Swiss-Prot record:
The keyword Zinc does not apply. Coiled coil: none annotated. This is Glycine cleavage system H protein. It comes from the Bacteria.
Amino acid sequence: MNTPKELRYSKEHEWVRVEGDKVRIGITDFAQSELGDIVFVELPEVGTEITANEPFGSVESVKTVSELYAPISGTIVEVNESLNDNPEYVNESPYEKAWMIVIEPKDLSEVDNLLTAEQYAAMVNEG
């Protein structure tokens, strides 16, 4: 399982990368491996307000549909449109090509409440 150390993680298996005053969000390698082959990604539009721990979109795999949960609150400023035509990026490159959204956070310090890579790996391994 790939768990980059520089990212923060939610208990719902989303990752967060702080990029200046913005935050990029996607799903973890563990999540994509559990879901199986991703066939569709549904994401909100730019300008949508998201709230921490609330659903903001979904991913559909050959096995199931899973909601995406916002790890922190903010306003969406960018959506990864390439996932419309290439949902397989979620399986192939969950931390690079398959980021889901970029937000302008309401409070960047919310990131501090998320799990470190070590904490996330421990949670997943306890399963």
